[in-house]
């Protein structure tokens, strides 16, 4: 039986580090962010719907989607954000499911669905186990400011636009505390995978 793991965390909690560790263990990772980019490529059904709803002003000169522009349109407009999610989420879910089924057919021991908004998008039904990568609030703030060159205000706004990390931790099957070293994180991950009988 393939164990389907949902990997999530808060913004800048170090989820991609853990995602990379899974890959190093030869466990396939299906990345929701990459799929979300692919499903809105020029000419795809979701792309056509976005242009229909938001108009050509969210396009670059070459006709591809101008993601930052679309992002700023929906960031401050709840109604438009919901409209966009209604187009993109089903397309992403469908593609993730397709890839997941492919790995299950291949008889993989485990497959990871790397979904930043696993809880917010109500996608927990796609996975068997939820693994949350967590950090302390001040670590999260510092990392986000450094990584995205955000002011404290901008970083706080981004963090607050997501479900609180402690809420995710409460709903997780297992939690990796990513405040320490890379080695410490790896040790925690290996212990969890042993517990789930995925690695020896």
Curated annotation (Swiss-Prot):
One of its GO terms (molecular function) is ATP binding. Residues 4-200 form the DPCK domain. ATP binds at residues 12-17. Keywords: ATP-binding, Coenzyme A biosynthesis, Cytoplasm, Kinase, Nucleotide-binding, Transferase. It is found in: Cytoplasm. SUPFAM superfamilies: P-loop containing nucleoside triphosphate hydrolases. CDD domains: DPCK. One of its GO terms (cellular component) is cytoplasm. Pathway: Cofactor biosynthesis; coenzyme A biosynthesis; CoA from (R)-pantothenate: step 5/5. It catalyses: 3'-dephospho-CoA + ATP = ADP + CoA + H(+). InterPro entries: Depp_CoAkinase, P-loop_NTPase. Its main location: cytoplasm. One of its GO terms (biological process) is coenzyme A biosynthetic process. The keyword Transferase applies. Belongs to the CoaE family. This is Dephospho-CoA kinase.
């Amino acid at each position: 039986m393939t164990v389907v793991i949902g990997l999530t965390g808060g913004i800048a909690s170090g989820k991609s580090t853990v995602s990379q560790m899974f890959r190093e263990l030869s466990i396939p990772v299906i990345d929701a962010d990459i799929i979300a980019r692919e499903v809105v490529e020029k000419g795809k059904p979701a792309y056509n719907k976005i242009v229909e709803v938001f108009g050509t002003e969210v396009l670059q000169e070459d006709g591809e989607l101008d993601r930052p522009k679309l992002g700023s349109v929906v960031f401050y407009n709840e109604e438009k954000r919901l409209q966009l999610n209604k187009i993109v989420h089903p397309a992403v879910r469908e593609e993730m499911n397709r890839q997941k089924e492919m790995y299950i057919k291949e008889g993989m021991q485990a497959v990871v669905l790397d979904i930043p908004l696993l809880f917010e998008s109500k996608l927990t039904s796609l996975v068997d186990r939820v693994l949350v990568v967590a950090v302390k609030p001040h670590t999260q703030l510092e990392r986000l400011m450094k990584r995205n060159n955000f002011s404290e205000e901008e970083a706080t706004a981004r963090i607050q636009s997501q479900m609180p990390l402690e809420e995710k931790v409460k709903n997780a099957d297992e939690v990796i505390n990513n405040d320490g070293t890379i080695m410490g994180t790896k040790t925690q991950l290996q212990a969890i995978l042993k517990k789930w009988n995925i690695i020896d």
